[in-house]
């Protein structure tokens, strides 16, 4: 692979890793904010999303290392809306996945 292509690939993979790490924080936060009698399955689903985001970040980081790059320590944007009703949380989760 050409050096320029490697640099582009590493940059993109680092962006993916940063985005996925923000998902870990976001979904973990959401799982702690859900309340009410129906919370258990929703909390489990949110924790599962956090685990999946961490796995994706790890894969992207491994590819960065494999290409001779340096995995980023940054994290993607985290916006706190202060809305913690389940509908708001699910809408924000959907928006994050787009």
List the predicted regions and their residue ranges:
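Iron-associated oxidoreductase/ferritin-like identity signal
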Residues: 1-98
């Amino acid at each position: 692979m050409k050096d320029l292509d490697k640099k582009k690939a590493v940059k993109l993979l680092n962006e993916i890793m940063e985005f996925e790490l923000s998902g870990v924080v976001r979904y973990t936060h959401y799982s702690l904010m859900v309340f009410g009698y129906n919370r258990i399955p929703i909390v489990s689903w949110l924790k599962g999303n956090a685990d999946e985001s961490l796995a994706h970040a790890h894969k992207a980081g491994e590819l960065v290392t494999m290409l001779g790059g340096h995995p980023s320590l940054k994290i993607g944007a985290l916006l706190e809306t202060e809305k913690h009703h389940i509908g708001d949380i699910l809408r924000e989760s959907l928006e994050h996945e787009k």
